[in-house]
Amino acid sequence: MIKRGHEPGAGLWSIPGGRIEPGETDAEALVREMFEETGLAVEVGPLIGSVRRPGLDGAVIDIRDYAATVTGGTLRPGDDAAAARWLEAADLDSLEITEGLIEALTDWGVLGQ
């Protein structure tokens, strides 16, 4: 997970992510964002869930989260990430997490009930 360095969610822990650039597929954006924010190379897996959240200035953000397998690199914060680290599900209760993330991951079956 990463600790967001900028708004929205500055200072909160979340899953790495970001905007899809013009012409990019979801998979291409995921690979790019993971490397930019964590230094990790990944292979994209299946979609695990999607959600809509309010953004800045009344915008709506469509979030699509995918499973991914790390294939290389060294974990380090970069780009929008102020920090990056591996976490166990039990660690999440002790961190300030972006709104709705725990609920979404639980609903999608990523975290236990």
List each model region and its residues.
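Residues at secondary-structure transition points
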Residues: 10, 17-25, 56-57, 61, ...
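N-terminal strand-loop-strand
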Residues: 1-13, 42, 46, 68
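Hydrophobic pocket/interface hotspot
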Residues: 2, 30, 34, 84
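Active-site-adjacent beta-strand/loop module that shapes the phosphate/pyrophosphate-binding cleft
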Residues: 51-74, 85
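The catalytic Nudix box helix
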Residues: 15-48
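Generic beta-structure capping elements
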Residues: 2-5, 18, 69, 80, ...
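Nudix hydrolase/Nudix homology domain
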Residues: 8-13, 76-113
